[in-house]
Amino acid sequence: MAFRQRLAKPLLYTTGAAALGGGVLYYTYRPRNIPGQDPAVVGPPGYGAEGSFRPPRFPKVRSRDDQIGDLKRSGGSKGAATGLFKSSEEAAPQNDADVYDLLVIGAGATGAGIALDAVTRGLRVAIVERDDFASGTSSKSTKLVHGGVRYLEKAVWELDYNQYALVKEALRERKYFLDTAPHLSSWLPIMLPLDKWWKAPYYWAGTKAYDFLAGSEGIESSYFLTRSKALDAFPMLKRDNLVGALVYYDGAHNDSRMNVSLAMTAALYGATVVNHIEVTGLEKDSNGQLCGARVKDLVQEKNGKKADEFVIRAKGIINATGPFTDSIRKMDDQNVKEIVAPSSGVHVVLPGYYSPQKMGLIDPKTSDGRVIFFLPWQGNTIAGTTDAPTKISYNPVAGEEEIDWILSEISHYLSPDINVRRGDVLAAWSGIRPLVKDPNAKNTESLVRNHLINVSPSGLLTCAGGKWTTYRQMAEEAVDEAVKTFSLSTKPVFNAPDVSGTEMVDDGARLDGSCQTHQVKLVGAHGFSKTLFINLIQHFGVETDVAKHLTESYGDRAWTVAALSVPTEKRFPVRGEKISALYPFIDGEVRYAVRHEYAQTAVDVLARRTRLAFLNAQAALEALPKVIDIMAGELKWDSKRKEVEWRDSKIFPPNHPSSLSHSFPISLSLLLSAFNY
């Protein structure tokens, strides 16, 4: 008996250690779901019996004019803007079915997400945007889909449950993000250099906690690199004091293309989606409750016509205007207290040789205690961001002080052999983060990137704050509140639209009237696979870099984009005329943007359908004449309209390389002198 007792304890310890070790090994090497690795739902095109090539055919969104027609019908015969309906009868359109359940103001990430959520719950939805989809903050992010590793550090050290909950929510949403749009998002390893040995266990524990919280929603476990391996992976690193590095995984995405895809998916599901239409006021009934909005079509003004003004009727109105949240709230109540604390985030774009193609870098402690990222993106390198209180403006610009600060910070951890020059900055931009105010916070960086939902006494539902990663969760909560506040009835969507183009829209989403956006694949996702670019090369004869770019920007819609590209009259490439010799953007993208994505201006194309203006301001300037000419052919612009486009065009981000100019925005005189146009 005594012998068995002496043996039991060591066996118990050994068994426990083996179980723990086995669990760690399984967690480390468990099977992962990598977006885009699954076979495409929509197969490649085939050939007819006679050998003719048959590309896939996809559904088109309704025309902008048709969408505006629906908006006008919601206002009925009394569609002229009045400011106040005298009675509910006077305000009612001829057909109550034309009244929208929800009118969403603002088509950034939050607004477009709300529109998609609501329409897939069977609600009648309209969404309007003063400028373009993602024209504000939503196109000016760091391009990360992240859980917020620095918020986890705060949660631990400050014992802040709210920070922990934010990280947990973001990690879950990160998985949904990559599942529903695998062509627009991917996993990115991010290196954290270590300059002291004692930091290794500290940050190792932090990254492992990040892995643990992600659970099955992660992809790869974080790992340690020795000094030599860190330099091999990131040769640009400074060698002095480098003792090693930790690498963890987060998501990366193409923010404005994601935003456009959200809006187009909502449109395909039946939402009325219109950009370049400005809300000039809110309409109330005789009881003081909101029942509509007055709007103005800004495209008409560009076309030299009087702006078309009319009223949109809806049972509920949602304010999702990001930094401009309070301006819409003041339309409802001029005395309302502001709830947004705007913060400026500046990024700069450098040539691709500043970073490896498939690994980013994070500096967790800059000279002033902030965090800075250094990431590969679209063949270039993004560095940023700053975080400082700012004033709200429609076109915020990146100041020289912020640009110099970023360049100074990145020079601290790059090799002395690399001279970080102001002239290397290809583009820079400033985005305004719509942080929710906390009266106890001393600075904007300490604010949690959380969101709030507020309903005014007159019925204006405002969704403010948040970040790209959690846009879907924000939208779900906003629609839940709207259904309750406005007494709306959701219903199953039995005749789901053929988004995939092959009657294979069944992507796992069961549209039963509840929120299903965690399963609704966005336009382009159904037929996407990692090998799709090979099919494009074989069928259309496009260049390899172009084919990869098209599949990673449009998913299965790359077939349509390639088909819209002109023949080159060369042996190779057979199709696709580049709008910039330095980047893989081609003429077919401009036509596709106009015909399928509601692009109305050259900036819509250069900044948000393609990303040329964000990648290289000089290249965007040089591409502008070609883009305007293609759009003029598509939209039937006359010479006056082209002149207006030249005059009004503002290349974003509105800052050039120092070799050109530091002034912004680009003026017509500069454009004309540059191109003799």
Feature roles, as predicted:
Residues 70-71, 77, 84, 131, ...:
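C-terminal accessory subdomains/tails of enzymes that are appended
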Residues 134-168:
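Glycine-rich active-site loop/strand segments that organize a redox cofactor
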Residues 2-101, 120:
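Extreme N-terminal leader/targeting segments of oxidoreductases
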Residues 275-291:
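A conserved short coil-to-beta-strand element within the FAD-binding core of flavoproteins
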Residues 98-100, 304-316:
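Core beta-strand elements of the Rossmann-like FAD/NAD(P) dinucleotide-binding domain
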